[in-house]
Amino acid sequence: MSAKTDEILESLKTLSLLEASELVKQIEEAFGVSAAASAGVVMAAPGAAGAGGGEAAEEKTEFDVVLESFDASAKIKVLKAVREATGLGLGDAKAMVEAAPKAIKEGVSKDEAEALKKAIEEVGGKVTLK
């Protein structure tokens, strides 16, 4: 790199997040470009922290398994499935099941989430993946 680009880079490293955001807006206006195309490079850290809109296009890798409801006659079976999946004690698992809709597990892989969903639905629970 040239001395000029090194100097610019060092200046950019000292910017706060708010200042960097303002700089991006000014660059977009001055050059008639959009930072959305290069968001993966320029906005990598903020995108990871503020997930949402950007992730809609990408396939999710982490899921929350949420027990929405269950058949009253299947409460004990659902309770056993939740205990097995979470490793919770009887009292904690019972409280979790009775608090439905309630997240049973959060941030699990797609395979694990689907397996847990299948196990709970087989015994009478209604589960969604978020």
Curated annotation (Swiss-Prot):
Matches recorded under InterPro entries: Ribosomal_bL12, Ribosomal_bL12_C, Ribosomal_bL12_C/ClpS-like, Ribosomal_bL12_oligo, Ribosomal_bL12_oligo_N_sf
Origin: domain of life: Bacteria
Keywords, sorted A to Z: Ribonucleoprotein, Ribosomal protein
GO biological process, one term: translation
SUPFAM superfamilies xrefs: ClpS-like, Ribosomal protein L7/12, oligomerisation (N-terminal) domain
GO CC entries: cytosolic large ribosomal subunit
Pfam family membership, one: Ribosomal_L12_N
MF (Gene Ontology): mRNA binding; structural constituent of ribosome
Gene3D superfamilies (UniProt xref): 3.30.1390.10, Single helix bin
Cysteines paired by S-S bonds: none
Record's function text: Forms part of the ribosomal stalk which helps the ribosome interact with GTP-bound translation factors. Is thus essential for accurate translation.
Subunit-structure text: Homodimer. Part of the ribosomal stalk of the 50S ribosomal subunit. Forms a multimeric L10(L12)X complex, where L10 forms an elongated spine to which 2 to 4 L12 dimers bind in a sequential fashion. Binds GTP-bound translation factors.
Membership in a protein family: Belongs to the bacterial ribosomal protein bL12 family.
Protein name in UniProt: Large ribosomal subunit protein bL12
